[in-house]
Amino acid sequence: NSLISDKTALSAAPADTDEFLISDAGTLKRIDYSLIKATNTPMILAVSNTSQTVSDSTTTKVTSLNTQPINTGGTWDSSNHRWTPGVAGTYFLAGQTSININNAGSYLQAMVYKNGSVISYNQVTAEGTNATYISQACIIDTADTDDYYELYIRHNTGGNSTINYDTAYKYTNFFGYKLT
């Protein structure tokens, strides 16, 4: 006769204090769900929601990331446009930039900075003209409690360019979350 049936099945995620039985070399032990569940916080998604002009051949901080649809733990500094996780750990971080490029051979770069220095970089080169281009940079990085991260952009289109933004499609964005 089984103690487990469809009448005892969980219909939602377990509570942190729910317990599981495990076998440790043949000895049954209890463990709370809170000790084994995945937690990817702190986490951030910052999205560009306004126009920002970027000068030709100039590395520029993206300061138009004014919407944070996800911001759990950590600190988004809207005056400095940077994220401080606030919890030591290993993080996945990524940034995406988008502009229109009118000249074949021009490039667009996305860069993730840590504490004022670039740690991840990606470049796309335009193959055609009059098209929207997106560059994405990502990295797994170890942070302490006061490290901070920022998104930068650079292009060489021959003149000023405006960052593409749309809060629905999130053309230009920065995100990060704790892995361990």
Q: Across the structure, where does each feature detected by a protein language model lie?
A:
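Generic detector of short, aliphatic-rich beta-strand segments that form the cores of beta-sheets
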Residues: N1, D32-Y33, F174-G176
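Solvent-exposed alpha-helices and their adjacent loops that cap or buttress functional pockets
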Residues: A13-P14, T142
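Short, surface-exposed terminal/edge motifs of secreted or surface/virion proteins that either
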Residues: I22-T39
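Extracellular jelly-roll beta-sandwich "head" domains, especially the C-terminal globular C1q domain
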Residues: A38-T180
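Short, surface-exposed beta-edge/turn micro-motifs
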Residues: A15-E19, A88-T90
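Short polybasic amphipathic segments
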Residues: E19-F20, A110
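Extracellular/surface-exposed low-complexity repeats and stalk/linker segments enriched in Gly/Pro
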Residues: N1-A13
